[in-house]
Amino acid sequence: MKSAEKSAKSLERRILHRVREAVAAYQLIEPGDRILVALSGGKDSMALLHFLSVMRRSNNGSFDLKAVHVRMANVDYRTDLQQLKEYAEQCGTGFELLDAAFEPDEKQGRSACFLCSWTRRKALFNYAQANGYNKIALGHHRDDLLQTAMMNLTFNGTFATMTASHAMDKFPITLIRPLCAVDEADLRLWADFTEVVATVKACPYDKIGKRHEMQGIMQQMQTFNPEFRQSLWHALNKAGKV
């Protein structure tokens, strides 16, 4: 077996192991669940659908999966929808395309990123509720959770982050993040090994704002202490914040 092939298989096993661990530790999936997978076309959501589909096959189809892409009419980005549909079919799931749009919020000053995210989320909620899905799987990885924790510490004075599982108040739906224990570096390697292309072209708002700046700060912290990310992750779990 070639070295690259061995590395790819080892990486696949490592990521799958961490997904399984997260699903068990945070009780993310139960038999009979009907789960929508938010498929943007980026590496994270592509990996999410792949590993959940692998779990589903190994669990004899004890839960249902369906991939959903929300197309934003007023955000200048492009996605190869045919590629997403074919990828979902390869993973053994259905595929649904939803259209949505948001209006700029000049009075309250909410960012375009917030409005876009909330509009997508609401479209997913409405579809899930109308079609009998009780959970929505999102592709946030461990670095996303750590970054959110740093944002909350810095700007809100709170020690909190996105949780692995979150039951919505106004919808009979639970958000789950099965990649929450997976490092982004592993997802990048997985995308390279499997030649899964991130079909989404760069969002115009992707490198604007405090969150992008925080990425640089966290890189500096990692240089200062190579165990920084692991220490923060341990603290979040010890405090029951994940």
Predicted features by range, described:
Residues 106-109, 210-212, 241:
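Short, solvent-exposed polar/charged micro-motifs at secondary-structure junctions
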Residues 18, 22, 217-220, 231, ...:
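Residues that form generic nucleotide/phosphate-binding pockets
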Residues 72-74, 102-104, 166, 182, ...:
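Residue-level detector of flexible, active-site-proximal loop/helix-junction positions
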Residues 64-65, 135, 143-223:
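Catalytic subdomain that performs nucleotidyl-dependent activation
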Residues 2-149, 155, 185-193:
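ATP-dependent adenylation/nucleotidyltransferase module used to activate substrates
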Residues 209, 227-242:
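A short, charged, Gly/Pro-tolerant segment at domain boundaries
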Residues 12, 117, 207-210, 225, ...:
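Generic structural signal for well-ordered, non-membrane alpha-helical segments
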